């Protein structure tokens, strides 16, 4: 039986994140995107950045993750995908730290498994202790996990992620910023996950102009 307490914890952490992207700026008619104003500077000169704003507590992000993985495998050479974990409340910050900790420990393979742990296995990955225990069960050195989780580097990346979300006017997840100039989402693409990635492809072409 599903735990009522777990459900409440997940609902609290997901508040805002479970709502598909509702743009703060005006959509461009049938073009299925919004302009980001002012445009966002790139952290990767010479490349078109595609930023995926996500939250581990968001079921829509969990659903689209396999599609994003497949899309990234065939992305053009002048495109770089960066996944950006965001927090809509203080309780979600540890999940941002979890993402960057796994990246720092060179375990990006665990990224999709976090979604599975939370949404399928119903694990309570809401604090450092629970996250550390789960990571250890996946073969991660617990001492290294704890050290990196609270490191200055991870804290800096979390802060930068929050700044990116603010600059892109993120109201919900998942959402995609392309070339620092355009934003799309499954909602803008007609409530269609695959459709959102098709719009991303179109915006990449538009960003080259």
Curated annotation (Swiss-Prot):
Give its localization: Periplasm
Q: What span is annotated as the signal peptide, if there is one?
A: 1-27
Q: Which GO terms describe its cellular component?
A: periplasmic space
UniProt keyword annotation of Disulfide bond present? yes
Is Translocase included in the keywords of this UniProt record? no
What domain of life does the UniProt record list for this protein's source? Bacteria
Known role: Involved in disulfide-bond formation. Acts by transferring its disulfide bond to other proteins. Required for periplasmic assembly of the pertussis toxin (PTX).
This one is known as Thiol:disulfide interchange protein DsbA
Q: Which gene encodes it?
A: dsbA
